[in-house]
Amino acid sequence: MALLWAAQGLSYIGDQIFDTTLVVWIASVLAKDQTWAPLAVSGVLIAVAIPTLVIGPLAGVFVDRADKRRMMIATDGVRAALIAFLLVSTGVVGGFRPSIEVQLASIYVVVFLTAAATQFFGPARISLVRDVVPEDARARAQSLSQVNASVSTIIGPPLAVPTLFVLGIQWALVANALSFVISLGLVVLVRPPAQPAHAPPGAAPSFMRELREGFQFAGRNVVVRTLLVSLFIVMLGGGALNALDVFFVINNLGTSANLYGFVGAAMGVGVLVGALLAGGLAGRIGLNRMYWMSLLSFGIFLLIYARLTSFIAALVLLFVVGFPQAAVNVAAAPILMGATPRELLGRVFSLVQPISATASILSTAGAGFLATSVLANLHAQVGPVRIGTYDTIFTVAGLLILAGGVYAWNNLNSAYGK
């Protein structure tokens, strides 16, 4: 497990450096002072979103058919090669500097293909974790994975900008490529137990049938369906926070946008601390209870956050919000592993990211629409409570997350007879 944990950590940090570097590189170098710069940056986000939504659900079929360790090795190798190709295609190395249009096109293609490869890596890693980690240690393993994600979020972006402007874009890309190469080497050293090959009796492999089997299992199994539906509901609320929090900080908390970075840092540290604590908490109260209790806590905290007017109080609360956010992430994967047969795990897990991304996109678009149209000029007073645009949207978001928690509470307790 230590090798998988180290490999994942390196990949996460490399991804954070890569993502941040590309955005800053496009905005401050390739598209500097251009009116189309925001559109160029948005192209990176679109290039990530498309494979997540389209390829993600399909990747699980191939993951379930393949050797999980070899799949991880192959995807790490592909991603390292793609980053190396980007060094050449953008003229960063080699002496030839193509036009801005060619450089941007190269970036979008590489980002798209890298994101596509990631859709195979994630389900393969989860399946391999299931093979090498005993059931009673999976919460602890997922807690360490969440620590990886939190640390990479905290240190990755701050490393990216100095690397870009002090050492140059070439070293930022090389660092990302090396992270995949080292991750590949660590996965090579993993020795999972032998597993019987899965082949449906009396039937030749059929992509559509196997894809349908994954969807049908996710729809029929109460535990899996509950996790996927509750995650969708929660992300409908969480997407609004991601989209509008900077405006809430400026308008409701009366704080300069220059201090907005502390908001993400406060929640990031909270998630890190929560991840360290969640493994032990799961052992005491159980994964299922930790999952729905964390969703309910997250919803309540967001309702409180919507009423705040103090920036310091908001930072403290966001630090606390990180605890249930980490606990949800720690609990979800082991619950899925326990409820899903090994031969279907890749297909089931590959639904998580597309479902979360779809809900987040809908929430972001809906919140942005409400904030700029229907609720744009909302100013009201109900007793001592002032009601405005952003706190109203966050209140609705908090209620959605609460609804997701109640749904999970009811269904998981019913499924496990509690």
Give the predicted meaning of each segment:
Residues 2-22, 44-83, 105-165, 175, ...:
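Substrate-agnostic recognition of the 12-TM MFS/MFS-like secondary transporter fold
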Residues 21-32, 86-99, 155-175, 251-252, ...:
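Transmembrane alpha-helix termini and helix-breaking/packing motifs in multi-pass membrane transporters
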Residues 1-2, 192-229, 418:
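Juxtamembrane intracellular "pre-TM" segments in multi-pass secondary transporters
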Residues 21-52, 258:
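Extracellular/periplasmic helix-loop-helix junction of adjacent transmembrane segments
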Residues 1-5, 38, 100-108, 210, ...:
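Primarily residues marking transmembrane-helix entry/exit sites
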